[in-house]
UniProtKB/Swiss-Prot annotation:
It comes from Pseudomonas savastanoi pv. phaseolicola (strain 1448A / Race 6) (Pseudomonas syringae pv. phaseolicola (strain 1448A / Race 6)). This is Large ribosomal subunit protein bL12. Pfam families: Ribosomal_L12 (PF00542), Ribosomal_L12_N (PF16320). Transmembrane segments: none annotated. Homodimer. Part of the ribosomal stalk of the 50S ribosomal subunit. Forms a multimeric L10(L12)X complex, where L10 forms an elongated spine to which 2 to 4 L12 dimers bind in a sequential fashion. Binds GTP-bound translation factors.
Amino acid sequence: MSISQDDILNAVAEMSVLQVVELIKAFEEKFGVTAAAGSAGPAVAAAVVEEQTEFNVMLLEAGEKKVNVIKAVRELTGLGLKEAKAVVDGAPAMVLEAVAKDAADKAKATLEEAGAKVELK
């Protein structure tokens, strides 16, 4: 004869608080477990947001002052004239990859000052 889950729940519902406490202790001893509340491990881990430390500087478009943007790309990357022009002509294009936030912000400001539209990713 098998006892259903509903039968067990109804039996527990009819117990006094003292009887439920004794039942919990019996479960702990019999099965080697504790009735302590589980930790919210995954929820806590999801709440921790890592701050991005590396950024990519993406040239979206050169704008009206293409020559100034080419000069800025050369200054930031150390590329030659031909290579820098190819980057600017190929926009949207990656100018710098995996740089620190302050370096990425500085590069973005330099390129925007030259007339380019830039995005940090």
